[in-house]
């Protein structure tokens, strides 16, 4: 299969290598032409995955139109805030029969829309059945080294999800299918916000009890929001739900947990973001989640506290104290 991956960050590069190693004809597009040329010349991504060499059947390209036009499947691996602009740049090309697989996890800040909804708006000539997402607990650093990983391919069309499953499934990268696109996308996006809270707990020096509470009550927030939007509650017990939430809250590779840890230590958001070479999606997603929750009347106190610590400079100890001193409630409401 001819597959194009848009976005040459750590995750896009990793997936391009995985697909090429499986035998697909793969093109990896980088937004900056000079970066694309360096990748093609070096045959590795020295910035994000140093030491992992590209397979021979992986080509790095500069021309977006050529890369998209010849592809049977297009994997969008750009940051969530850049997805609309990137998709709009190839919206005029023939897309009949092509599958668009989004792997960025986020909610668009100014619209509150999920990534599949953004794609449908930016690519008005494609059908919902052409869109899928690939989500789950899958840090690029481990996938690139072929360590065992499981994810979920999700689309409103089971046939589309199965095609994605067939394209990506390997002996080290196990792919399941799901058709609950709302649940998979909401869980995969909001978990980044909860991971920032988990990192803040680490930065404050709290222990396992606090981390377990954040993960569990964070899952409750994800459940309330996704249920309000019509998701299947069972999705949250799967890979894109509790699976991705746990790994993002605990892993040393988690950029969102790292941001939270630095905030918990008293550093300013701009300073932390400025020193990072990769995107922590939860920073922008926290804004979108708070707006969406307010509009839908969904209570999400942990997400709200993260927003206040990131954007209103609320001291982390004060935010945690306010969470603990909220009125007592039933566990499930």
UniProtKB/Swiss-Prot annotation:
Molecular function terms, GO-annotated: glycerol-3-phosphate dehydrogenase [NAD(P)+] activity; NAD binding
Gene3D superfamilies the record matches: N-(1-d-carboxylethyl)-l-norvaline Dehydrogenase, domain 2 (1.10.1040.10), NAD(P)-binding Rossmann-like Domain (3.40.50.720)
UniProt xrefs under PROSITE patterns: NAD_G3PDH (PS00957)
Active site per the UniProt annotation: 191 (proton acceptor)
Documented EC number(s): 1.1.1.94
Binding site for sn-glycerol 3-phosphate: 105, 136, 138, 191, 244, 254-256
Binding site for NADPH: 10-11, 31-32, 105, 140, 255, 279, 281
InterPro entries: 6-PGluconate_DH-like_C_sf (IPR008927), 6PGD_dom2 (IPR013328), G3P_DH_NAD-dep (IPR006168), G3P_DH_NAD-dep_C (IPR006109), G3P_DH_NAD-dep_N (IPR011128), NAD(P)-bd_dom_sf (IPR036291)
UniProt KW keywords: Cytoplasm, Lipid biosynthesis, Lipid metabolism, NAD, NADP, Nucleotide-binding, Oxidoreductase, Phospholipid biosynthesis, Phospholipid metabolism
GO biological process annotation, one example: glycerol-3-phosphate biosynthetic process
SUPFAM superfamilies from the UniProt entry: 6-phosphogluconate dehydrogenase C-terminal domain-like, NAD(P)-binding Rossmann-fold domains
GO cellular component, one term: cytosol
Catalyzed reactions: sn-glycerol 3-phosphate + NAD(+) = dihydroxyacetone phosphate + NADH + H(+); sn-glycerol 3-phosphate + NADP(+) = dihydroxyacetone phosphate + NADPH + H(+)
Annotated compartments: Cytoplasm
A Pfam family hit: NAD_Gly3P_dh_C
Associated pathway: Membrane lipid metabolism; glycerophospholipid metabolism
Entry similarity comment: Belongs to the NAD-dependent glycerol-3-phosphate dehydrogenase family.
NCBIfam families on file: PRK00094.1-2 (NF000940), PRK00094.1-3 (NF000941), PRK00094.1-4 (NF000942)
Task of the protein: Catalyzes the reduction of the glycolytic intermediate dihydroxyacetone phosphate (DHAP) to sn-glycerol 3-phosphate (G3P), the key precursor for phospholipid synthesis.
Protein name, per record: Glycerol-3-phosphate dehydrogenase [NAD(P)+]
Organism, as annotated: Chlorobaculum tepidum (strain ATCC 49652 / DSM 12025 / NBRC 103806 / TLS) (Chlorobium tepidum)
């Amino acid at each position: 299969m001819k597959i194009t991956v848009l976005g040459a960050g750590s995750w896009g590069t990793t997936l391009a290598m995985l697909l090429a190693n499986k035998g697909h004809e793969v093109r990896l597009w980088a937004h900056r032409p000079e970066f694309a040329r360096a990748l093609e010349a070096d045959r590795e991504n020295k910035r994000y995955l140093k030491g992992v060499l590209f397979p021979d059947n992986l080509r790095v390209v500069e021309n977006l139109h050529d890369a998209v036009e010849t592809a049977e499947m297009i994997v969008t691996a750009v940051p969530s805030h850049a997805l609309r602009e990137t998709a709009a740049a190839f919206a005029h090309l023939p897309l009949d029969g092509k599958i668009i697989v989004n792997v960025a996890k986020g909610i668009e800040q100014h619209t509150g829309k999920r990534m599949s909804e953004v794609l449908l708006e930016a690519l008005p000539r494609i059908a919902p059945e052409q869109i899928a997402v690939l989500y789950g607990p899958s840090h690029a650093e481990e996938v690139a080294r072929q360590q065992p990983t499981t994810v979920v391919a999700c689309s409103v069309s089971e046939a589309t999800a199965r095609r994605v499953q067939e394209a990506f499934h390997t002996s080290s990268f196990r792919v399941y299918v799901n058709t609950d696109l709302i649940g998979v996308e909401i869980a995969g996006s909001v978990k980044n916000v909860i991971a920032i809270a988990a990192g803040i707990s680490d930065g404050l020096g709290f222990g396992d009890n606090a981390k377990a509470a954040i993960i569990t009550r964070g899952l409750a927030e994800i459940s309330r929001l996704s249920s309000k939007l019509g998701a299947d509650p069972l999705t949250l017990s799967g890979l894109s739900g509790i699976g991705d939430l746990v790994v993002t809250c605990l892993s040393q590779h988690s950029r969102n947990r790292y941001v939270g840890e630095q905030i918990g230590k008293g550093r300013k958001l701009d300073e932390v973001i400025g020193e990072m070479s990769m995107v922590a999606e939860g920073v922008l997603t926290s804004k979108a989640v708070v707006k969406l929750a307010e509009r839908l009347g969904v209570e999400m106190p942990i997400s709200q506290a993260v927003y206040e610590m990131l954007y209103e400079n609320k001291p982390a100890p004060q935010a945690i104290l306010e969470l603990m001193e909220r009125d007592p409630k039933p566990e499930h409401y």
